[in-house]
């Protein structure tokens, strides 16, 4: 069961694209969003050298979202070292405890778990060269850190980074909208999907059409080709993992190999379209 949450957000310079601090009621964690260009200002915070984990966000040469996941005993000092790296990152999120209760073992544990969460979600390309080592910790500490992870994920998402969110996390929990929708169409198209908070998710194993029609738009053709090149669609034209499209129509078009209106093409087990449910 999900509960309502109260989030406190402090925008340091009145600029929503600048430095932001986020906290959650009754939680000792704190999350900072810092741009690369404003990292020096972070050093002025009393807790800037607290222990924690951090995430560096950027784009690769193909314009795909990337993330580097790290841990630090002294947060600002570690982040400053990354300024010497090539410009593979633009923004940073640092997660610390306000009372500095996290130790090195805690940070290593968090680094490993966030790495695995990001890999599982598949939202961004994780550019760590190795899998972070997971520390051995007590059952008490593990329970505490699992709650820490859950709260940190919520705040990272609130700041606009869905890097750790799986399809299950994003499913819209509202009446008929949380049921599966299906497409079974020409040229072998056979897919199922779900409405999620940031678009429409097509499930792993769904099959797309074996060919496309000549009238399919260039942008859709490029998207289909890109998904095949990245291995998200395999040689059998099936999705290798759950994949979130920005809209039901985009998802339907890739599945059917032609321009499509997703609000009328996707139907649930009762043969109701998304349009039917929205207007009922």
Give the residues covered by each predicted segment.
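Hydrophobic/aromatic-lined pockets within catalytic cores
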Residues: 84, 115, 119-123, 160, ...
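GIY-YIG nuclease catalytic motif and its immediate N-terminal context
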Residues: 1-84, 101, 105, 109, ...
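Short acidic beta-strand-loop surface patches of small beta-rich interaction domains
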Residues: 266-279
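Hydrophobic side chains in beta-strands
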Residues: 56, 72, 94-96, 204, ...
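Internal, well-ordered alpha/beta segment that forms a basic, Gly-enriched binding/recognition surface
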Residues: 90-150
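Short, solvent-exposed polar/charged micro-motifs at secondary-structure junctions
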Residues: 103-106, 248, 275-276
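Polyanion-binding interface signature
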Residues: 172-265
